[in-house]
């Protein structure tokens, strides 16, 4: 089973992904961590975004083929990246579910983004202006949407877990 999370920086994707990974004993693949490791390695690549996603796809597929549940944690901004995650699941012959994480309270979202700028690691994320001007395309297919505005991290994770359980209950076979 591949659980593909998407959403702008600061909406709570990684917090939810970590909680789900613990709850489901799943592999958590965070594209931001992959991209940071590539930058810190000194390797020169034409597009760090493309390289980070490609590494994520490969690691996800390897783990799915081992029978693990995988949680892909990335901005996942375009139909092309969303399709690529779904293709990973198809190649591994497992189900996949897409979950978009949003924060509908603009002030809360901005506060989250700005609070991360002074914290380690050195690459703690984009500025608010970079977040709001980012190329993030609307979804063109069915997916689950979870709004993290006004709820705690624990509540957001519980909402995500319940949404996945509801989704699974509509499947004929349990996730693998």
Tell where the protein language model's regions lie, with residue ranges:
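Walker A (P-loop) ATP-phosphate-binding motif of ABC ATPase nucleotide-binding domains
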Residues: 2
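P-loop (Walker A) phosphate-binding loop of NTP-binding proteins
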Residues: 8
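Conserved nucleotide-binding/hydrolysis micro-motifs of P-loop NTPases
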Residues: 33-35, 77, 102-108, 150-152
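Conserved phosphate-donor/acceptor-positioning beta-strand/loop module used by diverse small-molecule
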Residues: 92-112, 146
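Small-molecule kinase domains that catalyze NTP-dependent phosphoryl transfer to phosphate-bearing small molecules
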Residues: 115-159, 167-176
């Amino acid at each position: 089973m591949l659980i593909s999370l998407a959403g702008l920086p600061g909406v709570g994707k990684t917090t939810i992904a970590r909680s789900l990974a613990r709850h489901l004993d799943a592999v958590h693949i965070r594209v931001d961590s992959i991209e940071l490791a590539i930058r810190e390695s000194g390797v020169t690549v034409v597009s760090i975004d493309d390289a980070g996603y490609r590494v994520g796809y490969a690691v996800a597929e390897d783990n799915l083929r081992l029978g693990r549940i995988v949680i892909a944690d990335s901005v996942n901004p375009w139909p092309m990246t969303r399709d690529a995650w779904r293709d990973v699941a198809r190649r591994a012959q497992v189900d996949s579910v897409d979950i978009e994480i949003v924060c509908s309270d603009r002030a809360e979202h901005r506060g989250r983004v700005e609070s991360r700028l002074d914290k380690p690691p050195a690459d703690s994320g984009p500025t608010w202006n970079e977040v709001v001007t980012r190329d993030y395309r609307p979804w063109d297919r069915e997916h689950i949407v979870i709004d993290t505005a006004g709820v705690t991290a624990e509540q957001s994770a519980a909402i995500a877990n319940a949404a996945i359980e509801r989704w699974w209950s509509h499947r004929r076979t349990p996730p693998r």
